[in-house]
Amino acid sequence: MSRAVLALLLLSSFSCWSQNYPARPVKIVVPFAVGGSADVYGRFLAAKLSDSLGQPVVVENRPGGGAVVGTDAVAKSPADGYTVLVMSNTHTVNETLIPKKPYDLMKDLAPITGINSQDLLLVINAELKANNLKEFIALAKSQPGKLNYASSGPGTPYHMAGELFKHMAGVDIVHVPHKGSDQARTAVLGHQVDMMFDAISTIVSHTKGGKLKALGTSGKHRSAVTPDVPTIAEAGVPGYEATIWLGLMAPAATPRPVIDKLNAEVIKAINAADVKENWAKQGAVPMGMSPEEFGKFLREDVQKWSKLVKDTGMKVD
């Protein structure tokens, strides 16, 4: 049989198979604890895809090892489109921060598309004697190593936002990792920890209620959700920028027609007018892009955080 005929038969087989996909439930693995942004938006996506694909799409939370446990499970799953991964900045950070992983992000997983991105909010507990970012930086510099900040775990976007802040502001603030965003948030609200970065959508209500002080947002521009809060760059740390983003990947050998189908359905879901409107109120921006564009985005993000890890000598806590 000639190569051309074989290729044609394989293409026909994939095309027929993908037309019938999915023929059974699809599982979205979220390698983070319940309650964080990845979990919230993963469940949103599951509901939307259940409707559009005509099959149940279920979420399975598999936290552990800084997202390594759940990610490895997906990387080793059958490459048939029935197990996919919600992933984030944590994964691109881990490429440098955790070099001895049981998988290689860019070799063992295939990019599908980006889901959304959000700016973060730098908050401090209300008891601290600082009312703006410059005062907080001055306070931290006056007592190096005494103040601390919470994160949802090593290598998470919240951890990296904190390390980038320390590096650029020139302050010594101790990292206190927690098992998930909910625990980190509770620690700051309970005045057990001084500061944290969190997604605007999940923390803003506590700042409006006076339990926390909002000192700055992490994006290039002020957030529409908190228009009175300056960016960290304009409030005292020029050039600072950090966001949290989410994306979707599948095992590396997943057939391209399946990747394309999932890509199209996700983009359709996140670009719906009602979704855009709802997300805008939460400070989330749709990120729909082609698999190639998302792959390029991932490689660039790996490079960005690799530089910070190397510049600071950062290690997994």
Give each language-model segment a name.
Residues R3-S15:
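Bacterial N-terminal signal peptides
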Residues W17-K107, K146-N148, G170-F197, G288-M289, ...:
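N-terminal (or domain-start) structured segment
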Residues K76-G81, T96-Q183, I232, W245-N278:
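Hinge/capping helix and adjacent helix->loop/strand transition within the periplasmic-binding protein
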Residues H91-K100, H159, L164-M168, M195-V229:
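A ligand-binding cleft/hinge motif common to bilobed small-molecule-binding domains
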Residues A23-P25, H167-A169, K208, T231-E234, ...:
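An extracytoplasmic/periplasmic, membrane-proximal ligand-sensing/linker region
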Residues V86-H91, S151, G180-S181, F197-I203, ...:
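Beta->alpha turn/N-cap motifs
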Residues S18-N20, R24, K48-S52, A75, ...:
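Short hydrophobic alpha-helices and adjacent helix-cap/hinge residues
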